[in-house]
Amino acid sequence: HLHDEAVQVLASGIEDITNQLVDNFKLNEVLRMVLETLYRGLHFRRVVFCLREPKLDSLTGRFGLGDDIESAKGLVAAFKIPLHTAASASVDLFAAVCQRGVDTLIADATEHKIAERLPAWYQAKVHAPTFLLLPLAMKGATFALIYADKGHPNSIELSERELSLLRTLRNQAVMAFKQTG
C-alpha cells in the first residue's frame, strides 16, 4: 500500500535525521536530508527549500530536488516571497501563508480563486497544478519554507499519519537551525 510505504520512508528519514542532530552536524546536510525524505517518501515531483534573505526581508529559493531541478536552477532562483506586504498589495498566496505560518496544501492551483492569488514569478517559472507549503518559524516569525509539488491537480493526498510525519520533519529542520543558531 502506497501510504504504508510513504510512512516507512518518512519514519526512517526522521530517525536518520534524529541521529544526525545528536552528532556534530552540518546544517545544510540536515536540510538536504529533510528534503530528500519528503521527496522520496511522498513521491513529489519537485521540492524547494527557501530561506529568509535579511536584506530583502523575503524568502528566496536556496536549493531543491526533483525533476529538472539541476537544469532548472532558474526554478529555485524564481522563489522570492515577501515576508511583509502592504495591505493594499494584491494578496500573494505565498506571502499570506508565510505571514500566517500555516501549513497549506493547494489541491488544485488551476482553480480561479487560487490562480489569481499566485504570484507572477510562480506562474511564469514554477506553475505546478498542486503543491504543499510548510513554513518554518521561530519565535512566531517565518524564516524558511519547504515547497513541494506534483504534476497533476489533486494528486497530493496525505493521511493523518503522513501529515504528522511531515510536520515532524519540518520541526527537525527548525531544531537544526536552533542548534546552529
Where are these regions (language model features)?
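Short glycine-/small-residue motifs
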Residues: 144-145
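Signal-transducing coupling segments at domain and membrane junctions
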Residues: 101-130
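GAF sensory/regulatory domain recognition
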Residues: 50-86
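Signal-transmission linkers at sensory-effector interfaces
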Residues: 1-28, 179
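Regulatory loop-to-helix N-cap segments in sensory/regulatory domains
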Residues: 150-169, 176-181
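A short, aliphatic-rich beta-strand micro-motif
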Residues: 129-138
